[in-house]
Swiss-Prot record:
This is Serine hydroxymethyltransferase. It holds the Pfam family SHMT. (6S)-5,6,7,8-tetrahydrofolate binds at L121, G125, H126, L127, S355, P356, F357. Homodimer. One of its GO terms (molecular function) is glycine hydroxymethyltransferase activity. It comes from Cronobacter sakazakii (strain ATCC BAA-894) (Enterobacter sakazakii). It is an enzyme of class 2 (transferase). The record marks H228 as: Plays an important role in substrate specificity. GO terms for biological process: glycine biosynthetic process from serine; tetrahydrofolate interconversion. It catalyses: (6R)-5,10-methylene-5,6,7,8-tetrahydrofolate + glycine + H2O = (6S)-5,6,7,8-tetrahydrofolate + L-serine. Its EC number is 2.1.2.1. Catalyzes the reversible interconversion of serine and glycine with tetrahydrofolate (THF) serving as the one-carbon carrier. This reaction serves as the major source of one-carbon groups required for the biosynthesis of purines, thymidylate, methionine, and other important biomolecules. Also exhibits THF-independent aldolase activity toward beta-hydroxyamino acids, producing glycine and aldehydes, via a retro-aldol mechanism. GO terms for cellular component: cytosol. Its cofactor is pyridoxal 5'-phosphate.
Length: 417
């Protein structure tokens, strides 16, 4: 018999110490990595539930194992909420990650060797959109599209590439692009050559759910997302579609199970259901509106302090600082800010002269700081501290002074009260 009072602290002190240290790190550091966020205690409650014990290969009502009557309810709730939230008529909530969801879409729609048009990783795309080190770049013929001199997606070049190479699929979406994507324009380009339009909205799903960013679901043949990032749920993936055929939906389901995965993670699917319900609440819309406001407020400070922001601003939750003119590398900036308990990630910028392991920029996102209660006043102050460090990157006294301010503001705005 298993006793409910069993705990990690008494059994595995070494592991528990690391877990506790991570808890402290999250409370005492300001998180500005654009893909990170803080999930709710309700989501964590679902992830730590007895649902983790249940195998449920298949889909609701069509399982290979018995005893699935209650996990069927859980998964159907997640499916229905995903469809309602994003205006879809198909949803698959089983992918273990965004990359797994993307893999399933490739599997359902393409054959190895097919041509795909995807955003250049060096100009804002994602590994799974055709990077040569990823399955997408290894299995498919990838043609990259990019941005113009203003830092915006070059739709004219995209259309030209599509006409020339006749890809079977065009991918929309990004990991480091601060603009609004014209989904309708992308669908027009896809339709002109008879290609699928597949959108990976992982970074902006929360903004889309709140109506702060345009929804690709009405325009794309298939859409994927993660359920964390701006959506603030558990780590996992999701596939959506609207107006497609039952044949397409069957292909997508089969590409997830049994092609890519076995049993779904029912405790994570329950957590997805919780997060999707939370995303329907009025306060979630208020939160996402503040995410966008905070990103713009930070950009304003950096521009006023003489820093170059790729594309000159942001229309979502993230932006890139181009440090070439400051003679700084992203690696140096990342490390110096980290010593002040400010967490960012080094990131390549357009026409970056440095390697991806060094880079000439950093990516900054506002979802996590907004989640802990920061508004314009706080993020402007924060951006100013960051400029102080970047202006004096080798001055440890400046870094220590900023670190003290970071610890103070983190204490005033705890992640979990």
């Amino acid at each position: 018999m298993l006793k409910r009072e069993m705990n990690i602290a008494d059994y595995d002190a070494e592991l528990w110490q690391a877990m506790e240290q991570e808890k402290v790190r999250q409370e005492e550091h300001i998180e500005l990595i654009a893909s990170e966020n803080y999930t709710s205690p309700r989501v964590m409650q679902a992830q730590g539930s007895q649902l983790t014990n249940k195998y449920a290969e298949g889909y609701p009502g069509k399982r290979y194992y018995g005893g699935c009557e209650y996990v069927d309810i859980v998964e159907q709730l997640a499916i229905d909420r995903a469809k309602e939230l994003f205006g879809a008529d198909y949803a698959n909530v089983q992918p273990h990650s965004g990359s797994q969801a993307n893999f399933a879409v490739y599997t359902a729609l393409l054959q190895p060797g097919d041509t795909v048009l995807g955003m250049n990783l060096a100009q804002g795309g994602h590994l799974t959109h055709g990077s040569p080190v990823n399955f997408s770049g290894k299995l498919y013929n990838i043609i990259p599209y990019g941005i113009d001199e203003s830092g915006k997606i070059d739709y004219e070049d995209m259309a030209k590439q599509a006409k020339e190479h006749k890809p079977k699929m065009i991918i929309g979406g990004f990991s480091a692009y601060s603009g609004i994507v014209d989904w309708a324009k992308m669908r027009e380009i896809a339709d002109s050559i008879g290609a699928y339009l597949f959108v990976d909205m992982a970074h902006v799903a929360g903004l889309i759910a709140a109506g702060v960013y345009p929804n690709p679901v009405p325009h794309a043949h298939v859409v994927t997302t993660t359920t964390h990032k701006t959506l603030a749920g558990p780590r996992g993936g999701l596939i959506l579609a609207k107006g497609g055929s039952e044949e397409l939906y069957k292909k997508l389901n089969s590409a997830v199970f049994p092609s890519a995965q076995g049993g779904p993670l029912m405790h994570v699917i329950a957590a997805k259901a919780v997060a999707l319900k939370e995303a329907m609440e009025p306060e979630f819309k208020t939160y996402q509106q503040q995410v966008a406001k905070n990103a713009k407020a930070m950009v304003e400070v950096f521009l006023n302090r003489g820093y170059k922001v790729v594309s000159g601003g942001t229309e979502n939750h993230l932006f890139l600082l181009d440090l070439v003119d400051k003679n700084l590398t992203g690696k140096e900036a990342d490390a110096a800010l980290g010593r002040a308990n400010i967490t960012v990630n080094k990131n390549s910028v357009p026409n970056d002269p440095k390697s991806p392991f060094v880079t000439s920029g950093i990516r900054i996102g506002s979802p996590a700081v907004t989640r802990r209660g920061f508004k314009e006043a706080e993020v402007k102050e924060l951006a100013g501290w960051m400029c102080d460090i970047l202006d004096n990157i080798n001055d440890e006294a400046v870094i220590e002074r900023v670190k003290g301010k970071v610890l103070d503001i983190c204490a005033r705005f705890p992640v979990y009260a």
